[in-house]
Amino acid sequence: MTQPDTLTVDLSLLQSVLAKYAGRRREALLPLLHEAQALYGWLPREVQEAIGETLRVPLADIHGVVEFYSMFYNEPMARKVVRVCMDPACHMAGGAAVQLAIQERLGLKPGEADMEADIAYELVPCLGMCEHAPNALLGDRPAGDLTPADVDAFLAGVYPEPEPKIYGGPFIKLTRAGRVDPTSLADFEKYGGYDGLRNVMTMSPEEIIVQLKGSDVLGRGGAMFPVGLKWEMARQAPGEPSEKHIVANADESEPGTFKDRALMEQDPFSLIEAMTVAAYTVGASNGWIFLRGEYPRCEKRLRNAIDKARAAGYLGHNILGRKGFNFDIELRLGAGAYICGEETALFEAIEGKRGFPRIKPPYPTTHGLFNQPTVVNNVETLAAALSVIGMGVNQWRKLGTVDSPGTKWFCISGRVLRPGVYEVPFGLTIRQLVQLAGGQIGDEIQAVLVGGAAGVFVGPDQLDIPLTYEDAKAHNFPLGSGVIMVFDEAVDLHEIMYMLSRFFAHESCGKCYPCQLGTQRQMEILERITYHGGPQPSDRADLVDMGLTMTETSLCGLGQTAATAILSAIALWPELVQPAGRVNGRLR
């Protein structure tokens, strides 16, 4: 931690902020760091010391947390940061030209800051706006569909903010999106908001769990764990725990994933209602939304929704007049660490620590947040549970297939004419989804990435596979977070593979060696293949060996899936990593 010897830090600016946190402990560290950095633009040693004294956290621990999260700064930094996406969807949409235009306009290279102008420039992983590629953030102002001609307006802060693009149907979980004012509780109520909560309060928790089990709703974040079973396990947690928690995992950070942002921006009250229903069912009194730091509009709308729900009696003590039904929600903002999407790393982050994953067992339903019973669900999963309660099991099961009932949100991006979030029943094929998105831009589809950066590539001969849990299992590919990223014949797959490997090397927390070393070496090999001379004879064997080692020995899901897409590409197109293979990573 270095800073100029002559720098004077005015701690009087911090006193009113520290006063709000008097009596709090380490669990308040992340929000306090965010508030302090908003004052100073960075986190000087003196500020960290004052925070440590307030929360009773050692300076070394605070420094470790600041170093862990990419959006916190230990050294002087400009207050306004331009963050430009450098991942596949933006790359395919002309992101490099936008990056160059911003560099020339600012006179900065990536990672540099103009302290006099108080502005910095960074290239960052996916910002979760892939339907608006290329995209960027100017401080807390998002912008999408950028071209070099838009850069002046973007940097001036007058370029329009993008709205989620939502398509498909029938709309079940996104039925209000685009139809209501997302800042208005009255509008939400007018279109059926909180009818679900009132309905469940006429039922016993056991009856709700029976409904969820009958619906076969599985986790929508990738793990596919049955929701009814998870809620039941937390409700029945042994030992009469004093507190239970509901956690919404809104740390949506995987390249190509942007579905949860659509709900949080367009219908934020529904997430609050769904969490409250979960709390009633499980017997929880504490709710937490862990939101990625790069979603500023979601943050504003969720805070507004929480405040208005609390003021109207939908949160707090004796909710809707029910004595003893006490539940409240706190929004926690992340700071740029994909690993915090792993549920136990998320717990560590909320508790004010570095986001290292925990060893399991024990599992969250008995030993989760603060070592207490916890239900942690993805945003779409909570929306699905609320939908089942609202429409009933029989109506829910009329959609989709027998083994995959209901609807799913798919994030369609890349080389298609109409990228966006598509809510559709389970059972459509990959080809049908691509056609729904207007079809591919080029003459033919070269490949599709299914399930996200941690998913798999499929070739043109696999486009007629239905998107269901049973078909995904039969064909050995994950639905994951619902990513469908399309690559036509113009795309260099070498570049895409390198970008995926770069993402995981950047996001590995470093706790376990297989992931820490494997992701770095995987990236190095693919960078050389793509940009510095092409494949060597040993590359295929080395990549497969490293990939399998990471898959089998890494501690958490990040390392276990960091090579999944790469291994699938090698299996389909071994010539990509062999000498005299594909020309420029494209089909011959």
Task: Say what each PLM segment does.
Residues 138-141, 413, 417-419, 450-451:
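Short strand-turn-strand beta-turns centered on an Asx-Gly dipeptide
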Residues 180-183, 188-195, 246-260, 364-370, ...:
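Gly-rich Lys/Arg/Thr-decorated short loops/hinges at beta-loop-alpha junctions or inter-strand turns
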